[in-house]
Amino acid sequence: ELTGPNPIDRGRPGSKHHIVTDRNGIPLVVGLTAANVHDCKMLEYMLDHLPSLRNLHGKPTCHPQKLHADKGYDYPFCRQACTARHIKHRIARRGMESSTHLGKHRWVVERTFAWLHRYRRLLVRYERRADIHLAFLTLAAALIAFRFC
């Protein structure tokens, strides 16, 4: 379950990890979809499952202030989902040259993916059931978050 033909790996079945991090790279929400599901389909789920964050003064807030995303999320409904939740969005535009300004913020997520894939159980999916693989993914995210506490 939650596997589909991977467009990168010659059509072999695979799955895709989705993650939302804070500015330090600590994972806040993780998700799992089939490899052939587009990234933008998972954005609303990820935004709905964000935990309440604390601001600098220690008061809990209901949502993050800003969202940085790559060109895979450049669709009107992704921007509307952020606006409806009062989140400022900085999404790279499709068809335009890649901006180094947004890259300063997005490398944090790529580093977090590298931290997740240090756990070899997540690098290659051995589990048949998606709930078990998602449990390992959540456990790895919790261990990464625990390391920074």
Question: What positions do the PLM features span?
Answer:
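Polybasic low-complexity intrinsically disordered regions
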Residues: 1-94, 101, 140
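Basic, amphipathic alpha-helical segments enriched in Lys/Arg and hydrophobic/aromatic residues
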Residues: 76-80, 85, 89, 99-149
